[in-house]
Amino acid sequence: MAGRSGDSDDQLLLAVRLIKILYQSNPYPKPNGSRQARRNRRRRWRARQNQIDSISERIPSSCLGRPAEPVPLQLPPIERLRLDCSEDCGNSGTQGVGDPQISGEPCMVLGAGTKE
């Protein structure tokens, strides 16, 4: 966790440990008993799991003082994204990384799509 102070690393590890303990404290119910008993156990398990989910969402903001989710990444409109057929697709290098290929004409990758 480069670039951060050790104190926030300790707080992050503490938050992760707390969330892990919460989820481990609610194991999935055993598959024994009548159908109704199994259904009731699963229903109660789901209710506890929902409570754990809501608590674990609040832990990072209270322990670390920041929201749990990162800032959303702004993506270009999907209409402007396409696969570039002119590039060598077999190359595993860094060609085209970070440079979206935008063109006015569509690329024929799959063909016309008509059945014969």
UniProtKB/Swiss-Prot annotation:
Residues 36-47 have a biased composition (Basic residues). Keywords: AIDS, Host cytoplasm, Host nucleus, Host-virus interaction, Methylation, mRNA transport, Phosphoprotein, RNA-binding, Transport. A motif (Nuclear export signal and binding to XPO1) lies at residues 73-84. Residues 26-50, 91-116 are annotated as: Disordered. One of its GO terms (cellular component) is host cell cytoplasm. The keyword Phosphoprotein applies. GO terms for biological process: mRNA transport; viral process. HIV-1 lineages are divided in three main groups, M (for Major), O (for Outlier), and N (for New, or Non-M, Non-O). The vast majority of strains found worldwide belong to the group M. Group O seems to be endemic to and largely confined to Cameroon and neighboring countries in West Central Africa, where these viruses represent a small minority of HIV-1 strains. The group N is represented by a limited number of isolates from Cameroonian persons. The group M is further subdivided in 9 clades or subtypes (A to D, F to H, J and K). Homomultimer; when bound to the RRE. Multimeric assembly is essential for activity and may involve XPO1. Binds to human KPNB1, XPO1, TNPO1, RANBP5 and IPO7. Interacts with the viral Integrase. Interacts with human KHDRBS1. Interacts with human NAP1; this interaction decreases Rev multimerization and stimulates its activity. Interacts with human DEAD-box helicases DDX3 and DDX24; these interactions may serve for viral RNA export to the cytoplasm and packaging, respectively. The RNA-binding motif binds to the RRE, a 240 bp stem-and-loop structure present in incompletely spliced viral pre-mRNAs. This region also contains the NLS which mediates nuclear localization via KPNB1 binding and, when the N-terminal sequence is present, nucleolar targeting. These overlapping functions prevent Rev bound to RRE from undesirable return to the nucleus. When Rev binds the RRE, the NLS becomes masked while the NES remains accessible. The leucine-rich NES mediates binding to human XPO1. This is Protein Rev.
